[in-house]
């Protein structure tokens, strides 16, 4: 199985229209259009009953003390953790693409509704639900896609891995909260094939960024 996008090629930069924020010289960043990117796939294995899509960033700082702080940097060698940006379940076995902007076309304060979405699909909770938990203006359950917004003072280039799973079930049973860890656990034993596409993104100025 192969996964591709009209928006970006594998291991290249994600355009700003698909991000939560874009660089801004005066304020470090500005909010963006937050559209979900186009995705398409081929070479689906026989017996596929549905697809699941997971997008995660494995480069998120494990400690947030220096994140977006003037005069400080998030060190390249700081340990990193996963941050889930998109969980989309029960994609029809006959589907072969997701249209750009079909699941997100803006930033929604307090989060988009879910888990049910158009066409009988389900959206999981992305990790902005945790990130904004202490912010009265933004706190809420963030279902569906919300794009890149890495720290503007991070020395590390962030990678956004879109992984499509072909499954042997039409409806994926998920135990507990519909978050990244629960979805990955539910996938065990049901994956016929998988394919990934990686995009990169940063809000850091060139002089700060280190490419490892």
Please place each PLM-identified region on the residue numbering.
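N-terminus-centered regions that define maturation/targeting leaders and the start
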Residues: 1-212
